[in-house]
């Protein structure tokens, strides 16, 4: 062994060996239990950040641990390679997105290798490669023919700068998440997945996911949003509208129908269009409504506005005429684009009615008789739907509880054919059309005679041309006749290819399954390989993907199951959502009102005795800087740490050790230079300890009966540590406590008697085990140490150390001794010592004698294995 720990040399040697021997290649083996560990694959943005390092280290620790336990481990890696950033980079740099993407992939791959991850690179995939998206297109055509994918006009968020449709989640405070432009509403033809057909399965199967965080399951339940209610039909008031018809709404509160005082419709509703004819003010208001976001979150936050159409509908039970209002909070793409308003018992309607002086009719009161209704001030009980309330001012329905009123009113609506009990979901069908270039082409041909025709399987893939430089004004594909001009597969006539591409969430919804057989060119997945590897045993990624990616992947798994491609119902058996990597931020205010963010390494800090920052100044000019607080590492706040620079200074193992030791995986990890230095010191100490042992010469075997008390104590500590670390890695997934346990073991090693042949033999046992225990976290240094401890053997070929149960049986135990409840000393007795022998040993302790002050013992309490309390 080298005298000093040299991360660069140690890590290069291990990585070269692993690469040369294809150490992490996974092959199906029915004779062994499998373990599929997967990190959410990265977008090839150019460089890894510390969030990536933490995510992939967690997965790698679990994969390496399971390998030691004898599992056949698969840990693949690939690239979520389509997407808008590549187009933006292309426009900025004047190159094709493909070239930018492939260059980034090559660089990031070297970064991943430098971190020592146990990846099977033979299974690498990139979603922008035709051999990948070909199968996505194949599934699209299958689902289109089955009706699971359909086309319809949809109201969407349109970003006028990026010239594309945005998902609701890409709209932040009414603006596009990338461009910052005010989002408009537009109605365009789009392709949709009928994810709503799977809503009940997606909801029910959450109960099967015992290995998922409850928080994520709750978020998905809320997103799917199952509710029970009723469709309610309000017939048109022909006198005001001019013709017969009906307005249908869905409500979860039919019990409050008697309190409906108006209805509200979306700006795109036919009644709004009719009323706006010849009404300039209403036309202007409708135009204003159409310029906002269609995201529910944005609608919930914005000021509620409305305008009376002058039209009316008829209340289905009372026959009253109710005014029809256009309101900006009603979305055309949701349900019927209309809602019934019960201002007395819905907070949003309450605010709206008070703003526009609309009637507020109370139809619910507290069953206890307490509480007066105040139409000017909202109170929580107004919206209650439980046994605490009963109906009032509701005619024949008066005095009913929530459920009784619910059932009675729906019954009467059904009898009059003006309503129907209904279960509904908040979940909406998934619109996947994107007016973008760098994505998977939608495999549809538009024929004037035959309509929309799926591309035949023999003609797949529809290949995306890669030598294109977008200009930002719409999709380049729509300007390329060489791409879109084609012939109809049915009639042979002139036709046009679809120029929209798919939402990039489609690619990331099935990649985990493709890893089972990435080179299969006859099917989307090889059924035999998929049945061996799937489900993914452990999926690791950020909680920001709790809803969309994870919901879409669950949906796709069910689609593939229904196509006979996979056998299971769910893709991911266990899910670990790691916390963010955060760091201090520093800045100076600039004259233009913006902030100049200063990198932490350029700041000199002054701290108080408790470690709190009391002053900060710039390293260059010595002038003060503002402490901005702890935030997620990001380019925008200039508080990131470049993994590559870090590895060059400290090595990958220090990064891995610090990441796993600084915080439990599910919590945020605060970056600490002192913590990094501490991790580096520990690895140097580990190396030095092993080197000193190895340099002392060959170790002879020993018999357990030859051990002295110190050596027995060390073996007791060792085998207890093996037990604990296995539990920390496996069941608890708390890697910081596993590291702490090994540190404690090495502290015990330093204090133990490791002299002589027997002492050195015990030392060898401890160091071998400690090396194996730490190897999932710091694999390079452990590989180097193992080569020195056990020449001619390979660490990767070893098994997890076995617990010697005999070592955990102590022949002697230490008991604390108290006098009148106060600790006065300790005694060592035989583990099987009788009560009177324990009492005698305690009474004979010199410090105990001193504090008994010659008084007789009134009572002696022995707590087995723990303490003796003498009462005088």
UniProtKB/Swiss-Prot annotation:
Q: What family is this protein classified in?
A: Belongs to the class-I aminoacyl-tRNA synthetase family.
UniProt EC number: 6.1.1.4
User: What residues does ATP bind to?
Assistant: 635
Name any GO cellular component annotation. cytosol
Annotated localization: Cytoplasm
Q: Which HAMAP family match?
A: Leu_tRNA_synth_B (MF_00049_B)
Instruction: Give start-end ranges for motif 'KMSKS' region.
Output: 632-636
Question: Which cysteines are cross-linked by disulfides?
Answer: none
Its recorded reaction(s) are:
tRNA(Leu) + L-leucine + ATP = L-leucyl-tRNA(Leu) + AMP + diphosphate
Provide one Gene Ontology biological process annotation.
Answer: leucyl-tRNA aminoacylation
- Motif 'HIGH' region residues? 42-52
Molecular function GO labels: aminoacyl-tRNA deacylase activity; ATP binding; leucine-tRNA ligase activity
Q: Which PROSITE patterns match?
A: AA_TRNA_LIGASE_I
Show the Pfam families listed in the entry: Anticodon_1, tRNA-synt_1, tRNA-synt_1_2, tRNA-synt_1g
User: What superkingdom heads the lineage?
Assistant: Bacteria
Per UniProt, the keywords (alphabetical) are:
Aminoacyl-tRNA synthetase, ATP-binding, Cytoplasm, Ligase, Nucleotide-binding, Protein biosynthesis
Matching entries from CDD domains are given as: Anticodon_Ia_Leu_BEm, LeuRS_core
- State the NCBIfam families in the record: leuS_bact (TIGR00396)
Annotated InterPro entries: aa-tRNA-synth_I_CS (IPR001412), aa-tRNA-synth_Ia (IPR002300), Leu-tRNA-ligase (IPR002302), Leu_tRNA-synth_edit (IPR025709), M/V/L/I-tRNA-synth_anticd-bd (IPR013155), Methionyl/Leucyl_tRNA_Synth (IPR015413), Rossmann-like_a/b/a_fold (IPR014729), tRNAsynth_Ia_anticodon-bd (IPR009080)
Keyword Ligase, does the record have it?
Answer: yes
Protein name as catalogued: Leucine--tRNA ligase
